[in-house]
């Protein structure tokens, strides 16, 4: 078993499904929190579980530098190392290498660059990126790719796209030859595939509750109750567990090159496909145009992953047009800077007007932060540089993102996604 993808409901291009990995079931469309160094900043793993997170991201480049792939492998891979028994996705390190533009040299073989920590020389290739990701042991890993800058000349984009296609073939070849070396190895129970979407406990009964989430008046199943169990059921039939390698479509802002990249990546053959190379400085309107165009060329029966994109409005809109998986550092990064997402708009909690505001951060949010703490207290923590400020802010922002996706899934299932999205996109900034 690597992954299984099941589509449960559709409405236009939007779809609701479940993605089954060796470590659990994930409802799609899904937002995946980013845990760059095997840690979602400010939130311990038990709270992530409480929030209903069933998949998170790790960063191959950063984990390769510290603590090192060998140390993670010895602990049983990322799952054992970070005490997380739910699903994990790792990127290939390609985007991080791209961001080190002054320190890298790209060739057919791979990329020479220098560590951002100590300047030591490093080399990543499709083979070494696969070796690292197999050692880290995520459920879903990514082919090694090259991301082009924005703006970029067409010939530069074409050359990079073709290189990415050749690297994808090399990535798959190495992965197929070495995938048996995954650190958790052995067998994983795969009976999670039989669990219904609305049941966390695997009994088959509807255990979902209803409460407002994501927007005022939207009654949707709560995440903790609606999310499928992230662990396996007793008595399941063991199946050989392997990782799943996704291909990445590149091509910059050139729609015809995106089509060519999609066709070549599909020809190589992967169980899932990602759209990469966006959120690199282009206008948001251009991002959506590229995403919509690229989705037209991707298989409808495979999960589609949009990499590194997402305000709450954007993840809802991209779910509407057929994206299944999204990630972004925005909710955690914004939280550390006092920017909070609410059903009434974005709030900068550092503003003095909240000094005596005893109301909840978001009266329409059911997260533990909004249930317990006032805006005045959150403002005080942030103004005082208390670590707790970042923790509470991050918990709320992640809750808001996860609630948004839960509401999106619920609306799509009921055929109401257009109504829901119009409410999301009209939120003001406060």
Regions found by a protein language model. Give the residues of each.
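C-terminal extensions of enzymes
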Residues: 1-18, 26-30, 42, 145-151, ...
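Non-catalytic, usually N-terminal nucleic-acid engagement modules in DNA/RNA processing proteins
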Residues: 1-184, 352-355
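Conserved, mostly hydrophobic/aromatic
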Residues: 24, 56, 91, 133, ...
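Active-site pocket-lining/capping segments in soluble small-molecule metabolic enzymes
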Residues: 84, 89, 94-101, 107-111, ...
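Structural signal for hydrophobic packing residues in well-ordered secondary-structure cores
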Residues: 137, 168, 172-175, 179, ...
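Glycine- and acidic
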Residues: 149-154, 158, 272-278, 387-390
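Glycine-rich phosphate/ribose-binding loops and adjacent secondary-structure elements
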Residues: 178-181, 244-246, 250-361
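Intrinsic disorder/low-complexity segments
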Residues: 178-242
């Amino acid at each position: 078993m690597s992954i299984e993808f099941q589509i449960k409901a559709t409405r236009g291009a939007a779809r609701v499904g479940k993605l089954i990995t060796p470590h659990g079931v994930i409802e799609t469309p899904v937002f995946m929190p980013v845990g760059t160094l095997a840690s979602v900043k400010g939130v311990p793993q038990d709270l992530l579980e409480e929030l209903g997170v069933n998949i998170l991201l790790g960063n191959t480049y950063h984990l390769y530098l510290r603590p090192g792939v060998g140390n993670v492998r010895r602990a049983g891979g990322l799952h054992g190392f970070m005490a997380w028994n739910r699903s994990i996705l790792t990127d290939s390190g390609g985007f991080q290498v791209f961001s080190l533009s002054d320190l890298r040299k790209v060739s057919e073989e791979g990329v020479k660059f220098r560590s951002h920590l100590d300047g030591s020389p490093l080399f990543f290739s499709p083979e070494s990126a696969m070796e690292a990701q197999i050692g880290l042991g995520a459920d879903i890993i990514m082919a090694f790719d090259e991301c082009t800058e924005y703006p970029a000349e067409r010939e530069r984009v074409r050359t990079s796209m073709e290189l990415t296609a050749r690297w994808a073939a090399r990535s798959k070849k190495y992965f197929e030859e070495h995938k048996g070396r995954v650190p958790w190895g052995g067998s994983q129970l795969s009976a999670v595939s039989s669990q219904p979407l609305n049941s966390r406990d695997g009994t088959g009964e509807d255990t979902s509750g209803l409460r407002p989430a994501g927007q005022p008046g939207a009654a949707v199943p709560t995440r903790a109750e609606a999310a499928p169990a992230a662990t396996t059921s007793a008595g399941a039939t063991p199946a050989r567990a392997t990782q799943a390698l996704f291909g990445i479509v590149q091509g910059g802002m050139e729609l015809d090159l995106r089509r060519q990249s999609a066709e070549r990546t599909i020809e190589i053959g992967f169980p899932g496909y990602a759209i990469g190379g966006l959120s690199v400085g282009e206008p948001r309107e251009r991002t959506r145009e590229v995403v919509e165009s690229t989705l037209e060329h991707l298989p409808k029966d495979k999960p589609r992953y949009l990499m590194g994109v997402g305000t709450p409005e954007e993840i809802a809109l991209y779910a509407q047009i057929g994206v299944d998986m999204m990630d972004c550092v925005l909710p955690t990064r914004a939280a550390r800077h006092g920017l909070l997402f609410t059903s009434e708009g974005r709030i900068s909690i550092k503003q003095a007007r909240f000094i005596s505001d005893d109301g909840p951060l978001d009266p329409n949010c059911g997260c533990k932060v909004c249930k317990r703490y006032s805006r005045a207290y959150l403002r005080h923590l942030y103004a005082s540089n208390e670590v707790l400020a970042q923790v509470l802010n991050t918990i709320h922002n992640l809750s808001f993102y996860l609630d948004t996706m839960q509401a999106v899934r619920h609306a799509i299932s009921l055929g109401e996604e257009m109504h829901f999205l119009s409410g999301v996109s009209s939120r003001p900034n406060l």
